[in-house]
A protein has these predicted regions:
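Extracellular loop-to-transmembrane helix junctions
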Residues: 1-19, 72-102, 111, 354, ...
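Selective recognition of specific alpha-helical transmembrane segments in multi-pass small-molecule
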Residues: 7-19, 130, 134-138, 173-176, ...
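Membrane-interface "cap" regions at the ends of multi-pass membrane proteins
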Residues: 10-66
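Helix-loop-helix module between adjacent transmembrane segments
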Residues: 10-11, 90-106, 110-178, 253-257, ...
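Hydrophobic, membrane-embedded alpha-helices of multi-pass small-molecule transporters
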Residues: 47-64, 206-212, 225-299, 359-368
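Loop-to-transmembrane helix boundary motifs in multi-pass membrane proteins
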Residues: 123-127, 131, 162-167, 284-293, ...
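Hydrophobic alpha-helical segments and their helix-loop junctions in multi-pass secondary transporters
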Residues: 138-142, 146-156, 160-165, 177, ...
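Extracellular/periplasmic helix-exit of transmembrane alpha-helices
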Residues: 207-223, 284-343, 413-417
Length: 510
């Protein structure tokens, strides 16, 4: 628990110190923002700063800092280090700079920014890549809440139908994607964001009250086995199949750095009245998400390694797991991330906890899904030059967009392992998007004659992570660790040589 407290303090100091430095490097001023100069009453409009923060937090969070942190904790306390350093020096900086760069470019979406600084060909690649990722977000985040809702209502044949809830969620997606941002998103999302923050705060208080003995960074960096039979845990087998490098950095994305955020920040960049609010909104929302990830990583360690699962489930359920273990499921297989959320919230927080778990497991992914599709609509509209003031022109894009998303969802449901495959590719695509964004920000800082190492180092690191995952993953090239690591080093050298060559060429032209 001492490591947990130190990590919390580190994130707060990161916001106060490094966040201030990042804002100083960018240099926000009092120039008119797109919310004022391009106001259209649909996507460009001024919203209160507190509301923008809450919407931004909910948009970028979803279930990422919860599910990802729970699974990331299976690697041990080393997950704390990735959340701290990833969030402060990569994720929060990535979100702030991409959001502010969007403001400086009239509220432009990510592909437009990439095209401006990395070239037209890269822009076209990013357009396809971004829209595919956003459609995958929509498909993935409609499937899991539909399963949860059908399970809750399973006593009724109609209300307990998974297909019924998929249709309901998709209808909501269509409405939220088409309507002006202040009609649903501006009114409802702050409430959901408050619920997630309240849940995280209540769990943090519960951790301080219980003060469980957990592995510390300085004594058990990867080994978390304290009170359980190692065979029961299943973490050793998990780590063997998914090596810590690069899989930890893919598993914990939203709590450290996530390329998806760069598609969401422009949504709020179009609603900010003053550039100087960028630090608390963009950098602050990501630090807040990092704190949520820390809390859930600690809850996961308590649940699996301290024996917390025995305290949270009934004696009958505990005996049932023990009886089935021989040839059956390990702890991490029997209690997956959504199950841990439900059990811990209900056990620690009572009836209110069950409601909060429902909001976290259902509302959060749905709200990420609809803003993802809204971003896709705006990215496509920006690319083809179709204004979005009229409902008819919004439908021109939304109809084919939703048709393709439904196609991905149908494939996911028909394939026995479809969800897991989509999720893995979503995780890789998500982090690959951050690579494009970080290189874009690096070029921008070079052109502005500002310190570019702050984006160059994360860009190189995430380039290595994404290339290694592509080389080593069983669902991709599956080359084996030695070949994958060798290949990633070669890619790192190529990326660095490319940048240095471009940098020297650019300097000569100045």
């Amino acid at each position: 628990m001492v490591s947990f407290v130190i990590s919390l303090v580190a994130l707060v100091l990161g916001y106060l110190l490094y966040g201030k430095f990042v804002a100083h490097v960018f240099g926000p001023d009092d120039r008119p923002t797109p919310a004022v100069t391009k106001a259209d009453g649909v996507d460009f409009m001024v919203l209160p700063s507190w509301k923008i923060f809450m919407i931004q937090f909910l948009n970028i969070a979803g279930t990422g800092p919860i599910f990802g942190a729970i699974m990331g904790a299976w690697y041990g306390p080393v997950a704390y280090l990735w959340i701290i350093f990833g969030c402060i020096f990569a994720g929060a900086m990535h979100d702030y700079m991409s959001g502010m760069l969007s403001i400086r470019n009239g509220g432009a979406g990510l592909p437009e920014l990439v095209g401006k600084y990395l070239g037209g060909r890269t822009k076209k690649v990013m357009l396809v890549f971004s829209v595919l990722l956003l459609m995958m977000v929509g498909a993935v985040f409609v499937y899991s809440p539909a399963i949860i809702m059908s399970g809750i209502c399973n006593t009724d044949a109609f209300w307990g139908s998974q297909m019924f809830w998929i249709v309901v969620i998709f209808v909501y997606y269509v409405i939220a994607t088409l309507l002006p941002i202040d009609k649903i998103i501006g009114k409802v999302y702050p409430l959901f964001a408050f619920s997630l923050l309240f849940m995280a705060g209540a769990l943090m208080i519960g951790l301080f009250v219980k003060w469980p003995t957990l592995p510390e960074l300085w004594s058990n960096l990867q080994s978390c086995n304290l009170n359980e039979n190692p065979a029961w845990l299943g973490t050793e087998s998990f780590v063997q199949k998914s090596p810590i490098f690069p899989c930890l950095f893919i598993t914990i994305a939203c709590g450290a750095i996530s390329g998806f955020h760069a598609t969401q920040s422009p949504l709020m960049a179009r609603c900010m009245k003053n550039e100087k609010m960028g630090r608390p909104i963009f950098y602050g929302a990501m630090i807040t998400e990092g704190i949520v990830a820390l809390i859930w990583a600690t809850v996961s360690m308590y649940f699996f390694y301290y024996g917390g699962w025995r305290e949270c489930v009934s004696p009958e359920a505990a005996q049932q797991f023990i009886a089935q273990f021989d040839g059956g499921k390990s702890l991490i297989q029997n209690f997956d991330a959504p199950t841990v959320v439900k059990i811990v919230c209900s056990s620690w927080l009572g009836g209110a906890g069950g409601i909060l778990a429902l909001l976290g497991g259902v509302a959060a992914p749905i709200t990420s899904g609809d803003t993802a599709l809204r971003s896709a609509r705006l990215i496509i509209a920006e690319f083809i030059g179709l204004e979005q003031r009229s409902m008819r022109k919004r439908l021109y894009i939304c109809v084919p967009l939703f048709a393709l998303t439904v196609g991905i969802l149908v494939w996911q449901m028909e394939n026995p392992d479809g969800f897991n495959i989509i999720w893995q590719y979503f995780g890789w695509a998500n982090q690959t998007l951050s690579v494009f964004t970080l290189w874009t920000l690096t070029v921008y800082l070079v052109q502005q004659k500002k310190p570019f190492v702050m984006t160059l180092v994360p860009a190189l690191f995430m380039t290595v992570i994404c290339s290694t995952f592509l080389l080593i993953s069983p669902t991709a090239l599956a080359l084996g660790e030695s070949l994958a690591y060798t290949g990633s080093v070669i890619i790192l050298v190529i990326a660095l040589v490319w940048f240095l060559g471009w940098y020297r060429s650019y300097q000569k032209k100045q």
